[in-house]
C-alpha cells in the first residue's frame, strides 16, 4: 500500500527528555513533537505504515440491492451490492464500493487511504476503468433520470443505481461473473462495463515524502515534499518546539505559515540542540479524490472511494538529528511486486551506521542509503524491527494484502447450499460480514 512510511515507534534521543505536546486545533496544521516515549502506534491494531490521507471507520452497507454471483459448477448465490459509508477520523463522511468481492467486511473495521500500488489494483490492468465507472455513475452522477436515459436502463433508484455500479466494478476488480438481479440495474452495469476507459490513478489527498529524514543539528534538515489534493495546508510549530528554537521553513530558510502541493519543508535545528527526534504532522480539510483505494489493517475487504464530504486528512514524518556520528532515518514500503516490505535505511551523518534486521546485520556508509526487502506472504501479518547502537529502534507492523481472494469453492452439500467462504447472501446484514 503506498511508498515510504515511517514508523512512529521510534526509540532514540529525545529532544529535551520529555515529550513535546502536539496539540492540533485547526484544519491544516503542521506541528513538531518529540517522539520520545511515544509508545506503540500499533497498540490499537492500526497499521503504522499509513503514509497519509484519510483514516475512516466502516459504518456498513447503506444503499444496495441484490446481485447474483456465479460460484462455479453451475451454481449461483445472492449477495448484496451497493454503497458503503464510512466515518472519517476528525470529521467527514465517505461513500465506497467494494473491490474485493470474495472477502467479507468486518464490523466497524478501520480503513486507511492507500495508493493503488499497495492493493490489488496495482497489478490490475483494468484499474483505471473502475475509476471511469466511479466518475460516470452514481453517486457522482446524482441525476438518476439522466443516468438511466444515457445508459438505456429505463428507470433507476438510488438502490438499483448503486447495485448496477457495484456489479460493473466487480467485473473489473475481481473478474467476477456477477449480474444485478434488477433488470434496470443490470442494464446500467452492462453499459458501464462497455463504456469504461482506463484513467490514471487520482492524486493522494495528503502525504509527506519522504516521511523520515535526518541530518546534523545547526542545519536545515530535509526536504520533505508535500503532496496534496487540498488547496491549502497550514503549517506551524507548537510552543515547545518554538521554545527549543526549532522551525519549519521553506528551502530559503523562511518560516512557513501556509503550504500547498509541491511545497518543500525543512526542519531548521539550531546548533547545540541536544541530539533528538521530532515529528512533523500535516493536516488539512478537503474532499478526498474519487477513486482513492481504502485498505484495512485487519484484512476487511478492500474498498474504493465513490464520494466524500469535506474531511480531515493528515500525514506524518519524522526528523532525526545529531551533532556528529551516524544519523539514521528508516522508512518502509509495501512492495506487492516483490511480495514483501522494502525497509530503507538512510544515513546522513559522518560515520557508518550498523543495524540489525532480523538475524542479519547491515552497514550503511555515511551519506548513503540501503534497502532490504523482507519477504512476507500474501495476507500475512508482519512485525519488523530495525535496531542499532544506543538503543535505536524502529518498528513496522501491518498486513500484506496485495491480491483479491479467488473464487470460493462451491459447497459439496445438497442443492441450495451456500459456499462456505462466499459473500454473505443476505442483504439484511448491513453492518459487517457482507460484500458491497
Question: What spans do the regions from the language model cover?
Answer:
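Secretory targeting and sorting signals
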Residues: 1-44
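N-terminal low-complexity, Pro/Thr-rich disordered segments
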Residues: 20, 38-64, 204-205, 243-245, ...
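Short, surface-exposed polybasic-aromatic patches that bind anionic ligands, especially phosphate groups
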Residues: 44-198, 298-301
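Extracellular Ig-like/FN3 beta-sandwich strand-entry sites
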Residues: 164, 262, 273-279, 352, ...
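Acidic/charged, solvent-exposed loop-and-adjacent secondary-structure segments enriched in E/D, K/R, S/T
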Residues: 178-326
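Asparagine-centered strand-capping/turn motif at beta-strand->loop junctions
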Residues: 226-228, 342-349
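Intrinsically disordered, low-complexity Pro/Gly/Ser/Thr-rich segments with frequent PxxP/GP/PP motifs
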Residues: 251-268, 360-379
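Surface-exposed, short loops/turns at beta-strand junctions within beta-sandwich domains
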Residues: 269-277, 373-383, 401
